[in-house]
């Protein structure tokens, strides 16, 4: 947060209730009501009327105005003191970053220009919309604009100091009118002027340099300060001296400098703003065009008046301080000569000119030489068309760019010691901004751990073996060859042996990459998915057993993290930084614990839905895997976990995380820890947080994850296919009115149309994929009557009912129950199979009565009502025979 925002937020603590207080102290209402209440008491004679009009009403009106304008300020200070003693000040101050997200959102929505003010954006001395006091905001902003930090203002101060107040005021007016005209064009949208003027860069910049150099030349060639000081006692009479031409040149010079200069000392001070905007040129909100013109015009006028006032005050204060410094510290009471005073004045003027020259020279570094030469030709900075002409610091090899990035340099240097490392990214803005991502930023504890890896790799690094013959050339004439030998061995015997070996080798001229025998394989860093069966994994067991992790690697890492995390200062700073990052999100994104739990359930339901639609058809042993797992192999690979890819890794780097078996402890990881709570006995559902020790469990005894369900599921009768279909694709029926829902003709299931007796496997049909994860189970036309409705009112496939949740233990469930699904079953094998691996339909042998049919209709109607509610909860419904009884 910048100093401007910090100052603005601090003032908002005291004045946040000004608008509300203005609503209770309206000037017109107070004046009328007060007068109407007092007049009946005092009137009754002419003398009393005269006394009331002359002596009573003016003080009352003045008192009302005093209360209207100044009471909110005193009331704000009172609330500020109360908040200070109630320890709420720090809490209010910490919530300020949440406010700026609303402004960013309105900017993206493009509705910030003519939108009413925010209730929590009241600034210092700023009135409501109906009395927008932008004049005072501009007047206060001129406090920082008038500081003599730019070259133009330094020249104005020099004229004020050397030539007197008259020339100083003329120079200040030239600078101020030029500045206000620039603000006027920017705030009122004079695009032809602004775009055409700034498109001349860098010509306008060179124009500013020329004006400043011309001023320095005239100043040096002019008379000395002593000669000017002779006439300093006499007041300057502009008409008598007839220096109109000089006045016009001074005014025009400072006017042009206001449009051309771009550099100043302490440029951050000029961006300070007492208003609610981020800077002094931000457009404020207004309800109409006329109100916008009025507020912005008063704002510019306030800047104009304030700059004249504060510029004069600053110049007078600086000059008086210089004289007081000369009087106290330079000359004594007994030794005050005119020559010493003249020398002091000359020294101040000389130092001011040196400061002007220094600021001007320092501004040249803001423009690249290539940009200054090519921008007038239409080229942009770092244009690719000029990459072959100008010196380009961008690396063409992406691997080199990645290896040279901060945090990645050790891997590149370790693999190639012959590479000359040159860090050019700190001089190239384009490359420097794209080198680091958010996940790669290392905090102190992570830096210590990564630096330990660097030191460990440095100790284990071996010298890179080299060949005797490093380069070879082959000419067009194959009978003649040229060699350039770099001999690393001093003996002639070894040289002759290597030369003979090259002549005898037929493939000696083939360029080959010499492999480093000491290269370490980092296979152990790859964590295998523990849900794979061993028979399905194509790896070499001998090689896999030989590459195990180091035993002390995980323990040392935990010790380093614990060492830094128990440090109170580091812990507070880390928590403050993480909390501040989280607090900068939108206010509607901050959820409570019940909302987070509900969001987690929705995400699980959505992930199960997508997982049910996703087929791993390209995997080996797909049928066996689908039959055993019926879902993703691991929580790492499923859709739900992929949207949080990297979250657990980043958190585990910053904080010491461990699995705690205490059920009373609150969750330490959002989204992930509830999965561990659900499968507490089986920790390997989160195998990524288990230390790299392969002996902790056996692959043979690990049966993988439990199969998850895809909910909600629906069942209906497909009229086109004449089949019973179970699907997870929801088709909702929209009801416009409540009466339409009440008149929904839920058809009672007729007992005569119910098929008696169990179904046989011969009535089943081969499983077909109608839609994704929609299965056709029965082709018996008699089942259609169970889902029959009036086709004149509703279209086909509208009668979709919610399938019951997975409940294998309740065998008295009346309508449906769900089991695992086997993809593409063979009909011949199903007849001889004893495994229940189907969506099954249960039939009751008993005859149903009318009371049960009415209860069933009530439950079905309740389902449809819940579905048509416009929310996304995971509805589950159980239709139990016991509950009906």
Swiss-Prot record:
Source organism, top-level taxon: Eukaryota
Cellular component per GO, a single term: chloroplast membrane
Record membrane topology: Multi-pass membrane protein
Transmembrane segments: 62-82, 135-155, 168-188, 193-213, 299-319, 344-364
Subcellular location: Plastid, Chloroplast membrane
Gene transcribed to yield this protein: ycf78
UniProt KW keywords: Chloroplast, Membrane, Plastid, Transmembrane, Transmembrane helix
Similarity field: Belongs to the ycf78 family.
Predominant location category: plastid
Name of the molecule in the record: Uncharacterized membrane protein ycf78
